[in-house]
A protein has these predicted regions:
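Small-residue hinge/turn detector
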Residues: 323-324, 349
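Bacterial N-terminal signal peptides
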Residues: 2-12
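Metal-dependent phosphoester-hydrolase catalytic domains
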Residues: 60, 167-175, 185-289
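Alpha-helical interaction/regulatory segments in DNA maintenance proteins
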Residues: 299, 331, 340-364
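Active-site beta-strand/loop signature of hydrolases that rely on acidic residues for catalysis
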Residues: 23-28, 42-67, 98, 127, ...
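Acidic/histidine-rich helix-loop elements
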Residues: 25-37, 116, 146-153
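Active-site-proximal beta-strand elements of phosphoester/diester hydrolases
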Residues: 20-30, 107-110, 136-147
Length: 364
Protein backbone atom coordinates (compact mmCIF):
# COMPACT_ATOMS: atom_id res chain seq x y z
CA UNK A 1 0.00 0.00 0.00
CA UNK A 2 1.31 3.44 -0.87
CA UNK A 3 1.81 5.48 2.26
CA UNK A 4 0.97 8.69 0.51
CA UNK A 5 -1.37 10.02 -1.64
CA UNK A 6 14.16 8.71 -14.70
CA UNK A 7 22.29 13.22 -25.42
CA UNK A 8 21.17 12.10 -28.68
CA UNK A 9 20.94 14.59 -31.54
CA UNK A 10 17.63 16.26 -30.80
CA UNK A 11 15.72 18.10 -33.49
CA UNK A 12 12.49 20.05 -33.55
CA UNK A 13 9.43 17.83 -33.96
CA UNK A 14 6.99 18.07 -36.81
CA UNK A 15 3.41 18.96 -35.91
CA UNK A 16 0.96 16.10 -35.53
CA UNK A 17 -2.72 15.79 -34.67
CA UNK A 18 -1.87 14.09 -31.38
CA UNK A 19 0.22 15.90 -28.81
CA UNK A 20 3.23 13.86 -27.83
CA UNK A 21 3.71 12.50 -24.34
CA UNK A 22 7.17 11.54 -23.12
CA UNK A 23 7.44 8.79 -20.51
CA UNK A 24 10.78 8.30 -18.79
CA UNK A 25 12.62 6.42 -16.07
CA UNK A 26 15.61 7.56 -14.03
CA UNK A 27 17.64 6.17 -11.15
CA UNK A 28 18.56 9.33 -9.25
CA UNK A 29 21.29 7.79 -7.06
CA UNK A 30 20.41 8.38 -3.43
CA UNK A 31 18.21 11.42 -3.99
CA UNK A 32 17.53 13.07 -0.66
CA UNK A 33 20.72 12.11 1.11
CA UNK A 34 22.98 14.99 2.06
CA UNK A 35 25.16 14.41 -0.99
CA UNK A 36 25.14 17.79 -2.73
CA UNK A 37 22.76 16.75 -5.48
CA UNK A 38 21.99 19.64 -7.84
CA UNK A 39 18.22 19.48 -8.18
CA UNK A 40 18.18 22.38 -10.62
CA UNK A 41 20.18 20.22 -13.05
CA UNK A 42 17.93 17.23 -12.38
CA UNK A 43 14.94 19.45 -13.16
CA UNK A 44 16.57 20.74 -16.36
CA UNK A 45 16.69 17.17 -17.65
CA UNK A 46 13.33 16.04 -16.25
CA UNK A 47 11.60 19.08 -17.77
CA UNK A 48 11.80 17.34 -21.16
CA UNK A 49 9.51 14.58 -19.87
CA UNK A 50 5.80 14.42 -19.06
CA UNK A 51 5.88 11.39 -16.76
CA UNK A 52 9.07 10.24 -15.12
CA UNK A 53 9.48 7.41 -12.66
CA UNK A 54 12.31 7.66 -10.17
CA UNK A 55 14.30 5.09 -8.26
CA UNK A 56 16.59 5.60 -5.25
CA UNK A 57 14.44 8.28 -3.64
CA UNK A 58 15.84 8.25 -0.11
CA UNK A 59 13.62 10.96 1.38
CA UNK A 60 10.18 11.82 0.06
CA UNK A 61 10.77 15.54 0.64
CA UNK A 62 13.20 15.60 -2.28
CA UNK A 63 10.32 14.78 -4.64
CA UNK A 64 8.42 17.84 -3.44
CA UNK A 65 11.55 19.96 -3.91
CA UNK A 66 12.06 18.61 -7.42
CA UNK A 67 8.39 19.19 -8.21
CA UNK A 68 8.77 22.84 -7.22
CA UNK A 69 11.94 23.14 -9.31
CA UNK A 70 10.06 21.77 -12.32
CA UNK A 71 7.14 24.14 -11.83
CA UNK A 72 9.48 27.12 -11.57
CA UNK A 73 11.42 26.00 -14.64
CA UNK A 74 8.55 25.03 -16.94
CA UNK A 75 5.67 27.23 -15.80
CA UNK A 76 3.48 24.11 -15.71
CA UNK A 77 1.89 22.46 -12.72
CA UNK A 78 3.38 19.09 -11.75
CA UNK A 79 2.21 16.40 -9.39
CA UNK A 80 3.76 13.30 -7.85
CA UNK A 81 3.23 9.93 -6.20
CA UNK A 82 5.71 8.52 -3.70
CA UNK A 83 5.76 5.02 -2.22
CA UNK A 84 6.58 4.10 1.33
CA UNK A 85 10.14 2.95 1.98
CA UNK A 86 10.83 -0.51 0.55
CA UNK A 87 13.74 -2.86 1.21
CA UNK A 88 14.70 -5.87 3.28
CA UNK A 89 17.64 -4.52 5.25
CA UNK A 90 18.69 -1.27 6.84
CA UNK A 91 18.96 0.10 3.30
CA UNK A 92 15.57 1.23 2.04
CA UNK A 93 14.44 3.56 -0.71
CA UNK A 94 11.24 4.89 -2.23
CA UNK A 95 9.81 4.92 -5.72
CA UNK A 96 8.24 8.05 -7.17
CA UNK A 97 6.32 9.23 -10.20
CA UNK A 98 6.45 12.87 -11.29
CA UNK A 99 4.06 14.03 -13.99
CA UNK A 100 3.10 17.22 -15.83
CA UNK A 101 -0.56 17.94 -15.04
CA UNK A 102 -1.48 19.38 -18.43
CA UNK A 103 -0.31 16.23 -20.24
CA UNK A 104 -0.72 13.32 -17.83
CA UNK A 105 -3.38 12.55 -15.22
CA UNK A 106 -3.19 10.00 -12.44
CA UNK A 107 -6.15 7.63 -12.82
CA UNK A 108 -5.69 5.53 -9.71
CA UNK A 109 -4.57 2.15 -8.44
CA UNK A 110 -1.28 3.27 -6.93
CA UNK A 111 0.02 0.39 -4.84
CA UNK A 112 3.23 -1.30 -3.89
CA UNK A 113 3.18 -4.88 -5.21
CA UNK A 114 2.22 -7.27 -2.39
CA UNK A 115 4.77 -9.87 -3.56
CA UNK A 116 3.06 -13.05 -2.29
CA UNK A 117 6.18 -15.19 -2.87
CA UNK A 118 8.52 -12.60 -1.30
CA UNK A 119 10.71 -12.48 -4.39
CA UNK A 120 11.52 -8.77 -4.55
CA UNK A 121 13.88 -6.95 -2.22
CA UNK A 122 12.17 -3.71 -3.26
CA UNK A 123 8.58 -4.38 -4.30
CA UNK A 124 7.65 -2.35 -7.42
CA UNK A 125 5.23 0.58 -7.38
CA UNK A 126 2.24 0.21 -9.71
CA UNK A 127 -0.09 2.98 -10.91
CA UNK A 128 -2.38 3.86 -13.80
CA UNK A 129 -2.20 7.14 -15.71
CA UNK A 130 -4.06 8.79 -18.58
CA UNK A 131 -2.75 10.75 -21.57
CA UNK A 132 -4.97 13.81 -21.41
CA UNK A 133 -4.81 14.57 -25.13
CA UNK A 134 -6.15 11.17 -26.19
CA UNK A 135 -7.85 9.96 -23.02
CA UNK A 136 -5.89 6.71 -23.31
CA UNK A 137 -5.04 5.02 -20.03
CA UNK A 138 -1.90 2.98 -19.39
CA UNK A 139 -0.53 1.11 -16.40
CA UNK A 140 3.05 1.48 -15.23
CA UNK A 141 5.32 -0.47 -12.91
CA UNK A 142 8.32 1.30 -11.37
CA UNK A 143 11.06 -1.24 -10.67
CA UNK A 144 14.53 -1.35 -9.11
CA UNK A 145 15.95 -4.87 -9.28
CA UNK A 146 18.36 -5.91 -6.53
CA UNK A 147 22.00 -5.95 -7.66
CA UNK A 148 23.23 -8.66 -5.29
CA UNK A 149 26.47 -10.51 -5.82
CA UNK A 150 25.78 -11.90 -9.28
CA UNK A 151 23.21 -12.30 -12.04
CA UNK A 152 21.88 -15.31 -10.16
CA UNK A 153 20.65 -12.93 -7.44
CA UNK A 154 18.88 -10.72 -9.97
CA UNK A 155 17.33 -13.38 -12.18
CA UNK A 156 14.46 -14.42 -9.85
CA UNK A 157 13.23 -10.83 -9.66
CA UNK A 158 13.51 -10.41 -13.43
CA UNK A 159 11.49 -13.57 -14.00
CA UNK A 160 8.86 -12.47 -11.47
CA UNK A 161 8.16 -9.35 -13.54
CA UNK A 162 5.98 -11.60 -15.70
CA UNK A 163 3.71 -12.09 -12.67
CA UNK A 164 3.51 -8.34 -12.20
CA UNK A 165 2.60 -7.85 -15.85
CA UNK A 166 -0.13 -10.50 -15.55
CA UNK A 167 -1.48 -8.72 -12.47
CA UNK A 168 -1.52 -5.35 -14.25
CA UNK A 169 -3.49 -6.89 -17.12
CA UNK A 170 -5.86 -8.60 -14.69
CA UNK A 171 -6.57 -5.35 -12.86
CA UNK A 172 -6.97 -3.29 -16.04
CA UNK A 173 -7.91 -5.58 -18.96
CA UNK A 174 -7.27 -4.03 -22.35
CA UNK A 175 -5.11 -1.26 -20.88
CA UNK A 176 -1.54 -0.98 -22.23
CA UNK A 177 1.06 -1.70 -19.57
CA UNK A 178 4.75 -0.88 -19.29
CA UNK A 179 7.42 -2.01 -16.85
CA UNK A 180 10.24 0.47 -16.43
CA UNK A 181 13.14 1.18 -14.15
CA UNK A 182 16.66 0.10 -13.26
CA UNK A 183 16.87 -3.64 -13.86
CA UNK A 184 20.59 -4.12 -13.18
CA UNK A 185 20.61 -6.55 -16.09
CA UNK A 186 21.00 -6.19 -19.85
CA UNK A 187 17.87 -6.96 -21.91
CA UNK A 188 19.65 -9.78 -23.75
CA UNK A 189 19.95 -12.04 -20.69
CA UNK A 190 17.97 -15.34 -20.59
CA UNK A 191 16.10 -14.28 -17.43
CA UNK A 192 13.91 -12.03 -19.58
CA UNK A 193 12.44 -15.05 -21.38
CA UNK A 194 9.17 -15.14 -19.41
CA UNK A 195 8.45 -11.48 -20.13
CA UNK A 196 9.33 -11.92 -23.80
CA UNK A 197 6.93 -14.85 -24.00
CA UNK A 198 4.15 -12.44 -22.98
CA UNK A 199 5.02 -10.22 -25.95
CA UNK A 200 7.05 -7.54 -24.17
CA UNK A 201 10.20 -6.10 -25.69
CA UNK A 202 12.84 -3.65 -24.43
CA UNK A 203 12.59 -0.11 -25.75
CA UNK A 204 16.36 0.41 -25.59
CA UNK A 205 18.38 -2.32 -27.30
CA UNK A 206 21.71 -0.61 -28.02
CA UNK A 207 24.17 1.47 -26.05
CA UNK A 208 24.26 1.80 -22.27
CA UNK A 209 22.71 3.87 -19.50
CA UNK A 210 25.20 3.88 -16.62
CA UNK A 211 27.92 6.53 -16.68
CA UNK A 212 31.54 5.44 -16.59
CA UNK A 213 34.08 7.86 -15.14
CA UNK A 214 35.38 8.58 -18.65
CA UNK A 215 33.59 11.36 -20.52
CA UNK A 216 31.39 10.07 -23.32
CA UNK A 217 31.59 6.44 -22.23
CA UNK A 218 28.69 4.45 -20.80
CA UNK A 219 29.11 1.09 -19.12
CA UNK A 220 25.94 -1.01 -18.85
CA UNK A 221 22.45 -1.12 -20.34
CA UNK A 222 20.55 -1.54 -17.07
CA UNK A 223 17.72 0.98 -17.40
CA UNK A 224 14.86 0.27 -19.77
CA UNK A 225 11.17 0.33 -20.55
CA UNK A 226 9.54 -3.01 -21.40
CA UNK A 227 6.40 -2.72 -23.49
CA UNK A 228 4.25 -4.53 -26.07
CA UNK A 229 5.08 -2.79 -29.38
CA UNK A 230 1.58 -3.29 -30.81
CA UNK A 231 0.17 -1.30 -27.87
CA UNK A 232 2.50 1.60 -28.67
CA UNK A 233 2.66 1.47 -32.49
CA UNK A 234 4.35 4.84 -33.04
CA UNK A 235 6.62 4.87 -30.02
CA UNK A 236 10.36 5.15 -30.03
CA UNK A 237 12.90 6.16 -27.42
CA UNK A 238 16.50 6.68 -26.47
CA UNK A 239 18.95 7.39 -23.69
CA UNK A 240 19.07 11.04 -22.60
CA UNK A 241 22.82 11.60 -22.25
CA UNK A 242 22.50 14.44 -19.81
CA UNK A 243 26.22 15.23 -19.27
CA UNK A 244 26.37 16.38 -22.91
CA UNK A 245 23.22 18.45 -22.51
CA UNK A 246 24.35 20.09 -19.26
CA UNK A 247 27.91 20.51 -20.49
CA UNK A 248 29.48 18.71 -17.53
CA UNK A 249 32.02 15.91 -17.16
CA UNK A 250 31.02 12.40 -16.19
CA UNK A 251 32.80 12.85 -12.85
CA UNK A 252 30.70 15.94 -12.12
CA UNK A 253 27.54 14.28 -13.41
CA UNK A 254 28.03 11.25 -11.17
CA UNK A 255 28.68 13.44 -8.13
CA UNK A 256 26.02 16.12 -8.66
CA UNK A 257 23.22 14.42 -10.60
CA UNK A 258 23.35 10.63 -11.02
CA UNK A 259 25.45 7.75 -12.26
CA UNK A 260 22.53 6.67 -14.47
CA UNK A 261 21.17 8.45 -17.54
CA UNK A 262 17.38 8.57 -17.94
CA UNK A 263 15.69 6.68 -20.74
CA UNK A 264 12.52 7.86 -22.40
CA UNK A 265 9.65 6.70 -24.60
CA UNK A 266 8.12 9.15 -27.07
CA UNK A 267 4.50 8.02 -27.48
CA UNK A 268 4.00 9.45 -30.98
CA UNK A 269 7.57 8.82 -32.09
CA UNK A 270 8.42 12.52 -32.25
CA UNK A 271 11.98 13.57 -31.55
CA UNK A 272 12.64 15.50 -28.38
CA UNK A 273 13.47 19.17 -28.75
CA UNK A 274 16.18 20.30 -26.34
CA UNK A 275 15.20 23.16 -24.09
CA UNK A 276 17.72 26.02 -24.07
CA UNK A 277 20.28 26.51 -21.33
CA UNK A 278 21.68 29.87 -20.35
CA UNK A 279 25.26 29.84 -19.13
CA UNK A 280 24.99 26.13 -18.54
CA UNK A 281 21.89 26.60 -16.40
CA UNK A 282 18.21 26.02 -17.25
CA UNK A 283 16.12 29.06 -18.10
CA UNK A 284 13.32 29.39 -15.56
CA UNK A 285 9.86 30.43 -16.63
CA UNK A 286 10.56 33.48 -14.52
CA UNK A 287 8.53 36.53 -13.62
CA UNK A 288 5.57 35.62 -15.81
CA UNK A 289 4.98 32.42 -13.87
CA UNK A 290 5.53 34.12 -10.52
CA UNK A 291 3.03 36.82 -11.50
CA UNK A 292 0.49 34.25 -12.63
CA UNK A 293 0.82 32.31 -9.38
CA UNK A 294 0.53 35.46 -7.30
CA UNK A 295 -2.59 36.44 -9.21
CA UNK A 296 -4.07 32.99 -8.72
CA UNK A 297 -3.33 33.02 -5.00
CA UNK A 298 -4.78 36.52 -4.65
CA UNK A 299 -8.00 35.63 -6.43
CA UNK A 300 -8.38 32.40 -4.48
CA UNK A 301 -7.80 34.13 -1.18
CA UNK A 302 -10.95 36.16 -1.75
CA UNK A 303 -12.99 32.96 -2.07
CA UNK A 304 -14.38 30.78 0.71
CA UNK A 305 -11.65 29.24 2.85
CA UNK A 306 -10.75 25.58 2.39
CA UNK A 307 -11.63 23.16 5.19
CA UNK A 308 -9.41 20.07 5.15
CA UNK A 309 -12.24 17.95 6.53
CA UNK A 310 -15.09 19.03 4.23
CA UNK A 311 -13.57 20.39 0.99
CA UNK A 312 -13.94 18.37 -2.20
CA UNK A 313 -11.01 17.42 -4.45
CA UNK A 314 -11.38 20.48 -6.71
CA UNK A 315 -11.34 22.82 -3.72
CA UNK A 316 -8.29 21.13 -2.20
CA UNK A 317 -6.52 21.38 -5.58
CA UNK A 318 -6.57 25.17 -5.14
CA UNK A 319 -3.96 24.88 -2.39
CA UNK A 320 -0.30 25.41 -3.43
CA UNK A 321 1.39 22.21 -4.62
CA UNK A 322 -1.76 20.11 -4.05
CA UNK A 323 -2.70 18.28 -7.22
CA UNK A 324 -5.38 15.63 -7.77
CA UNK A 325 -3.39 12.81 -6.16
CA UNK A 326 -2.65 14.71 -2.96
CA UNK A 327 -6.20 16.03 -2.82
CA UNK A 328 -7.47 12.45 -2.94
CA UNK A 329 -5.04 11.47 -0.20
CA UNK A 330 -6.16 14.34 2.03
CA UNK A 331 -9.75 13.15 1.68
CA UNK A 332 -8.76 9.54 2.35
CA UNK A 333 -6.83 10.38 5.54
CA UNK A 334 -9.55 12.45 7.22
CA UNK A 335 -10.15 13.68 9.87
CA UNK A 336 -7.50 16.38 10.24
CA UNK A 337 -7.06 18.19 13.55
CA UNK A 338 -4.54 20.72 12.24
CA UNK A 339 -2.80 21.77 9.04
CA UNK A 340 0.51 20.67 10.55
CA UNK A 341 -0.55 17.07 10.05
CA UNK A 342 -0.37 17.52 6.26
CA UNK A 343 3.26 16.41 6.37
CA UNK A 344 1.79 12.89 6.52
CA UNK A 345 1.00 13.33 2.82
CA UNK A 346 3.59 12.18 0.33
CA UNK A 347 5.72 15.04 -0.96
CA UNK A 348 4.53 17.60 1.61
CA UNK A 349 7.51 18.60 3.70
CA UNK A 350 7.88 21.59 5.97
CA UNK A 351 8.66 23.89 3.04
CA UNK A 352 5.52 22.94 1.13
CA UNK A 353 3.45 23.10 4.33
CA UNK A 354 4.71 26.65 4.94
CA UNK A 355 3.57 27.65 1.43
CA UNK A 356 0.12 26.17 2.03
CA UNK A 357 -0.28 27.98 5.34
CA UNK A 358 1.12 31.24 3.92
CA UNK A 359 -1.41 31.16 1.07
CA UNK A 360 -4.15 32.06 3.53
CA UNK A 361 -6.53 29.66 1.81
CA UNK A 362 -7.03 27.28 4.74
CA UNK A 363 -9.82 27.83 7.20
CA UNK A 364 -8.45 28.81 10.59
Amino acid sequence: VVTALAVPVLLGAAATSQANAVIASWNLKHAGWNNGKHLEQVAAVASHMDLIDLQEVMKEEVVSELEQQLEALTGDEWDSLVSHAVGRSTYTERYAYLYRDKTIAYQGGATVYLDPEDVFSREPLLATFVEKDTGRAFSAANVHIVYGDSKADRSPEIRALADIYDLMKEISPGTPAIIMGDFNMAPTEPAWGDLRTLGLRPLITEGATTLSKTDGRYASLYDNIWYVPSEWPKANGDVFRFPDYLGISHETARADVSDHAPIYLSVTGETLALLPLEGGQPQAAGAEVASRRASKTSSLASQTCIDLNTANADQLDRLPNIGPARAADIIRQRPWSSSGQLTRISGIGQGTLSEIVASGLLCS
